[in-house]
Amino acid sequence: MSDIAEIKSLAETQGTLLSTTRELKSWMEKANGEIAASKTVENETKSAMEKLSTKAAELTEKCLELERKMSDS
């Protein structure tokens, strides 16, 4: 992969990570409201948070991998 393609891929991955993190934050705020109101978290909220947490971890790993590739070049 060329340097420009790697930089573009990293930027795209970082953008996706940022939007995923924002969406996760929104679901976490919803969960906090549910906990405050009922002392439980709805299944939909819990499922969304788990899915987004996994996606964020995968995107973070991809960013690190791309950064390693770029530093090795």
Specify the residue positions occupied by each region the protein language model found.
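Intrinsically disordered, low-complexity terminal tails
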Residues: 1-73
